[in-house]
Amino acid sequence: MKLIIFTGLVLFAIVSLIEAEEESGRVCIPLNGECSKSPDKCCDNINCDCYLRFEKGVQTGRPCFCTEKDVIFERDE
C-alpha cells in the first residue's frame, strides 16, 4: 500500500515539474503562426489577430494568426 502511495506521489511530482518547465521555457509563436489556442504566446512585437469566418452566412470558425503590431488588413474586392 505504501508503494502505491509513494508511486502516485512521484508521478504527481514529475507531472508538476513538466508543466512548470513548459510554462517557464515556452516557445513563442512566430509571425503568421496560428495562435487560436494560445493568443498570448506570439513573439515580441507581434499581436494575435482573429477574424470570424463565414460560409453561406454561417459562422464556421474564428482563426487567429500572429501579425505585426499596428498593421491593418483590408478585404480585396
UniProtKB/Swiss-Prot annotation:
Coiled coil: none annotated. GO terms for molecular function: ion channel inhibitor activity; toxin activity. Contains 4 disulfide bonds. Expressed by the venom gland. Transmembrane segments: none annotated. Residues 1-20 form the signal peptide. Pfam families: Toxin_35. One of its GO terms (cellular component) is extracellular region. It is found in: Secreted. Residues 21-26 form a propeptide. Its main location: secreted. InterPro entries: Spider_toxin_CSTX_knottin, Spidertoxin. Keywords: Disulfide bond, Secreted, Signal, Toxin. Belongs to the neurotoxin 19 (CSTX) family. 09 (U10-Lctx) subfamily. This is U10-lycotoxin-Ls1a. It comes from Lycosa singoriensis. The lineage of its organism: Eukaryota, Metazoa, Ecdysozoa, Arthropoda, Chelicerata.
